[in-house]
Amino acid sequence: MTNIRKMHPLAKIINNSLIDLPAPSNISAWWNFGSLLAVCLALQILTGLFLAMHYTSDTTTAFSSVTHICRDVNYGWIIRYMHANGASMFFICLYMHVGRGLYYGSYTLMETWNIGIILLFTIMATAFMGYVLPWGQMSFWGATVITNLLSAVPYIGTNLVEWIWGGFSVDKATLTRFFAFHFILPFVASALVMVHLLFLHETGSNNPSGVSSDSDKIPFHPYYTIKDILGALLLILILMLLVMFSPDLLGDPDNYIPANPLSTPPHIKPEWYFLFAYAILRSIPNKLGGVLALLLSILILAIIPLLHTSKQRGMMFRPISQFLFWLLVADLLTLTWIGGQPVEHPFIAIGQLASILYFTILLILMPIAGIIENYILKW
């Protein structure tokens, strides 16, 4: 009798995605981040659900409801900090996952890559709205500053901002709708993950060598299930170390002050995982220009496949491109640092240089490096 997992309509889907899936035999730990992201998403939905049971999305009670969760709800503090730091782990895994795609040329799987970009935007929107919910100073002013960017849209900008606010400033209506969106978007993301995997399984995974692995496949289970479980355990270990020993390490102390529209914090800044984009936004002295640069800093990923000039897929055997890739990583770390600094000399100049370098590497230097490497190999 044929195994039920290969026959049952539902079990068959799971079987073909997680058990009998033919996987390349040489994929490294950089291929672990996909499953780690799934773990992060599941953790965030679970902890978020329990937080939503005790949270109230009203300007008068939001801040105290979060305090109530931490003080009075059984294990409320651990749920709250797992959710807050879980977001940080989520973004670490996201950036590693995208970095892997850039390094090994996974962006040649166009549909998977583009769905991934949409997913990235969805999760960034979710995280931004989640940061507003505790209704601390940084929540309120972060929401005010970021939503205000839409006023740079010609002609309809002001109307657009007021429509999103549900009034003439960030207030009760804004908080309520942000909570609604923050609750629903992770489920939208889950659906997109399914589509992401659907497209990935049409072509099969890429591998470090960049060469087709059709002739050398191994079953996903047990080889990669055990590897993914190890990765997940390490992820949870790091998350719990963060939660137990320094839960506020990555947060902003200003968010422990209740939101006050009459007092602006000295430095308004988003969570650390948005600082690189925030630095690019601030480095352009024009409002509309800054907003466009902010959008392009992520949207540039969509044109990466069109800029691929090398005749090799990944960067494994391309030292010039490798150098540029790690220069890009260093540049992004520099931008992250600058985003958290006040707007004054020399940070402004460093931010502008780092922003120019970011776009130059991706749009100009990497395609040129590909051509040079082809030439060196006489291809």
Curated annotation (Swiss-Prot):
Its main location: mitochondrion. The keyword Membrane applies. Binds 2 heme b groups non-covalently. InterPro entries: Cyt_b/b6_C (IPR005798), Cyt_b/b6_C_sf (IPR036150), Cyt_b/b6_N (IPR005797), Cytb/b6-like_sf (IPR027387), Cytochrome_b (IPR030689), Cytochrome_b_C_euk/bac (IPR048260), Cytochrome_b_N_euk/bac (IPR048259), Di-haem_cyt_TM (IPR016174). GO terms for molecular function: metal ion binding; ubiquinol-cytochrome-c reductase activity. Heme b b566 binds at H97, H196. Coiled coil: none annotated. One of its GO terms (cellular component) is mitochondrial inner membrane. It is a multi-pass membrane protein. It is found in: Mitochondrion inner membrane. Component of the ubiquinol-cytochrome c reductase complex (complex III or cytochrome b-c1 complex) that is part of the mitochondrial respiratory chain. The b-c1 complex mediates electron transfer from ubiquinol to cytochrome c. Contributes to the generation of a proton gradient across the mitochondrial membrane that is then used for ATP synthesis. Heme 1 (or BL or b562) is low-potential and absorbs at about 562 nm, and heme 2 (or BH or b566) is high-potential and absorbs at about 566 nm. PANTHER family: CYTOCHROME B (PTHR19271:SF16). This is Cytochrome b. It comes from Arctocephalus australis (South American fur seal).
